[in-house]
């Protein structure tokens, strides 16, 4: 009797197992991921109950006390322990306390390349309770000046290799802004912070300078192009920094991992997910000044790297490298990032071995994140029942002719069906707030949708088209608005158009992105109308864009038109131009290509077009 009962129970459990695998194949993946999220939530609540407000800086100081001799940063072969980073950041804090009027709450802009001093200065300023604004190290002239003016800093700290960029705009900076250079010898008008460090104390900074009163207080400004206009300073709260720093842990990284970071630290991926993630874990990172496809695997083997951060373009570059022996002979087990296309994903795994690719999605300033913890190729994550407990989002219909969300006769938005691309929007509430941008409320309000499904509701507009399949996996489709991504960076079309508009022979410039086979994102293209009685100066145009814009923002293709179509609200139409691309056989208008060897734009011939399509000409 007992035997038959046990046999029946076993058969029943086995049947349930197969039924679960058939009907709910991702249940346990989702469930264990949920437990991780709940565990972290409980930890945060315990801090609150004890009256503690723990920040990423607090966690770093805790690790420093527990493991002072452990390597925190490895850079160009040099090892910086947790204690080393703590002491140098103390020196920076004391030097600024003794030689400036900086105080708690002041904004300090940071213009530095990837190097240990980026972290030293960041943490040193955090110990003073300052808000740190990360500036894109590629920016120059008006773009750089715009970002500095936007965040209204009291001071700017500049890396030794970028002093030339700040020197160019020094006369235009507000008089009260003090500029510090991380170099002994600095240009006139800039103070040497490096010079002050030798005499500065490395003793701990009194906690009273940085103890926070609320996790919603501003910690950082990180610049983002979003979907419209010039770069905006996204307000990053202490809470957002904490959330960003748990990404590596949520994907399964541990304190024993060695994490390879080549992404720029001025981006949230490099700073919050990368450096912040190492702090959360108490792990070690290998920091690189720039990504090198030829050096990547050598570094991974040399430093016993187990985890690396990526953007899709990075993985594509690695796949394009010449094959060599022992490509699967490494210790890398996880890769965390975003923007990885399905074809590169498959190619990467086939060539470099069983690495778990942890794709994620999230805007710097956004209030929603997707994390693909199942390894489903091409997906950014899965929206299941458990996920809906934490994030409320919808995919809504979009009117491409009016360039705005579609609304019915009653004024309400409507959701798309599964399999259809729709605009991703996320509910703004106490659980998932949107902190907006520095400066005018206009920028903040422009990212919000009001009265979407009912009177009074508010949603964050991501500006991204996504779709959801029958298994509830979510996929990125395309980006809307006045930006596109190229070389892993957001390009603001209005900024590029403004630079072109300063040329005396251009009447109107319409900037957009076009897809190029073999490349992630979209390459920049501009369609222009010439002023009456003015001729096109291709060399002058080339010089204008390369001196005023970062390399990734320079238009690679140029189209000359007689007239441009506009929408009912007088916005320039882009959709048809994007679809037509840059094929000289399909477009009768004159086309040109940016030739860096000739330092000019040259006619885009059928031969050049074919060389681009076959990747003989590299972009």
UniProtKB/Swiss-Prot annotation:
Gene Ontology terms: cellular component: endoplasmic reticulum; sarcolemma
Reactions the enzyme catalyzes: a fatty acid(in) = a fatty acid(out); hexadecanoate(out) = hexadecanoate(in); (9Z,12Z)-octadecadienoate(out) = (9Z,12Z)-octadecadienoate(in); (9Z)-octadecenoate(out) = (9Z)-octadecenoate(in)
Enzyme class: ligase
Source organism of this protein record: Mus musculus
Assigned EC number: 6.2.1.15, 6.2.1.3, 6.2.1.-
Protein family according to the UniProt entry: Belongs to the ATP-dependent AMP-binding enzyme family.
Gene Ontology BP terms: lipid transport; long-chain fatty acid metabolic process
Alphabetized Gene3D superfamilies for the sequence: 3.30.300.30, N-terminal domain of ligase-like
Pfam families: AMP-binding (PF00501), AMP-binding_C (PF13193)
Superkingdom: Eukaryota
Cell location: Cell membrane, Sarcolemma; Cell membrane
Name under which the protein is recorded: Long-chain fatty acid transport protein 6
Record-listed AMP binding positions: 221-232
One MF annotation (Gene Ontology) recorded for this entry: very long-chain fatty acid-CoA ligase activity
Keywords: Cell membrane, Fatty acid metabolism, Ligase, Lipid metabolism, Lipid transport, Membrane, Nucleotide-binding, Transmembrane, Transmembrane helix, Transport
Keyword check for tRNA-binding: no
Role of this protein: Mediates the import of long-chain fatty acids (LCFA) into the cell by facilitating their transport at the plasma membrane. Also functions as an acyl-CoA ligase catalyzing the ATP-dependent formation of fatty acyl-CoA using LCFA and very-long-chain fatty acids (VLCFA) as substrates. Plays a pivotal role in regulating available LCFA substrates from exogenous sources in tissues undergoing high levels of beta-oxidation such as the heart.
InterPro entries reported for this sequence: AMP-bd_C, AMP-bd_C_sf, AMP-binding_CS, AMP-dep_synth/lig_dom, ANL_N_sf
Membrane disposition: Multi-pass membrane protein
SUPFAM superfamilies: Acetyl-CoA synthetase-like
Signal peptide (UniProt feature, chain positions): none
């Amino acid at each position: 009797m007992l035997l038959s009962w046990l046999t029946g129970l076993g058969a029943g459990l086995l049947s349930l197992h197969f039924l679960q695998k058939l009907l709910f194949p991702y249940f346990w993946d989702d469930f264990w991921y949920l437990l991780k999220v709940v565990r972290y939530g409980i930890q945060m609540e315990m801090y609150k109950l004890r009256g503690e407000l723990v920040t990423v800086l607090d966690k770093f100081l805790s690790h420093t006390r527990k493991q002072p001799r452990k390597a925190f940063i490895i850079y160009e072969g040099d090892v910086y322990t947790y204690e080393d980073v703590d002491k140098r950041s103390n020196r920076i804090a004391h030097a600024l306390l003794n030689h400036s009027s900086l105080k708690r709450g002041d904004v300090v802009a940071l213009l530095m390349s990837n190097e240990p001093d980026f972290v030293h200065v960041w943490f040193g300023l955090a110990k003073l309770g300052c808000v740190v604004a990360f500036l894109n190290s590629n920016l120059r002239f008006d773009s750089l000046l715009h970002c500095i003016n936007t965040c209204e800093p009291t001071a700017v700290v500049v890396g030794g290799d970028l002093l030339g960029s700040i020197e160019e705009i020094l006369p235009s900076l507000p008089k009260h802004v003090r500029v510090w250079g991380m170099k002994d010898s600095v240009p006139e008008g800039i103070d040497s912070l490096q010079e002050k460090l030798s005499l500065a104390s490395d003793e701990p900074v009194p906690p009273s300078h940085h103890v926070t009163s609320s996790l919603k207080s501003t910690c950082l400004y990180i610049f983002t192009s979003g979907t419209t206009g010039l770069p905006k300073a996204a307000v990053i709260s202490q809470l957002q920094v904490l959330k960003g720093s748990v990404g590596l842990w949520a994907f399964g990284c541990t304190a024993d991992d060695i994490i390879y970071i080549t992404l720029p630290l001025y981006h949230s991926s490099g700073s919050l997910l990368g450096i912040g993630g190492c702090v959360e874990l108490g792990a070690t990172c290998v920091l690189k000044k720039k990504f090198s496809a030829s050096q990547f695997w050598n570094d991974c083997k040399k430093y016993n790297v187990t985890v690396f951060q990526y953007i899709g373009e990075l993985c594509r570059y690695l796949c394009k490298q010449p094959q060599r022996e022992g490509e699967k002979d490494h210790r890398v087990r996880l890769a965390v990032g975003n923007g990885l296309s399905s074809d590169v994903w498959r190619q990467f795994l086939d060539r470099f071995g069983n690495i778990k690719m942890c794709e994620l999605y999230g805007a710097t300033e956004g209030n929603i994140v997707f994390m693909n913890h199942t390894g489903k190729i091409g997906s950014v994550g899965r929206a299941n029942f458990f996920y809906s407990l934490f994030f409320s989002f919808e995919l809504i219909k979009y009117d491409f002719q009016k360039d705005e969300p579609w609304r019915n006769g009653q004024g309400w938005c409507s959701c798309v069906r599964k399999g259809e691309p729709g605009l991703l929007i996320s509910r703004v509430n106490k659980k998932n707030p949107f902190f907006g941008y520095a400066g005018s409320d206009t920028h903040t309000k422009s990212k919000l949708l009001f009265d979407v499904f009912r009177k009074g509701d508010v949603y964050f507009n991501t500006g991204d088209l996504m779709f959801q399949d029958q298994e509830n996996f979510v996929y990125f489709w395309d980006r809307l608005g006045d930006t596109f991504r190229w070389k892993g960076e957001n390009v603001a079309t209005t900024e590029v158009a403004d630079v072109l508009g300063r040329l005396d022979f251009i009447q109107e410039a319409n900037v957009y992105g076009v897809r190029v086979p073999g490349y992630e994102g979209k390459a920049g293209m501009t369609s222009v109308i010439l002023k009456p009685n003015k001729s096109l100066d291709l060399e002058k145009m080339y010089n204008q864009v390369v001196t005023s814009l970062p390399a990734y923002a320079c238009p690679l293709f140029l189209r000359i038109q007689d007239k441009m179509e506009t929408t009912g609200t007088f916005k320039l139409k882009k959709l048809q131009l994007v679809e037509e691309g840059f094929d000289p056989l399909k477009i009768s208008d004159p086309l040109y290509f940016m030739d860096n060897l000739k330092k000019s734009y040259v006619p885009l011939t059928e031969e050049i077009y074919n060389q681009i399509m076959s990747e003989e000409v590299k972009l």
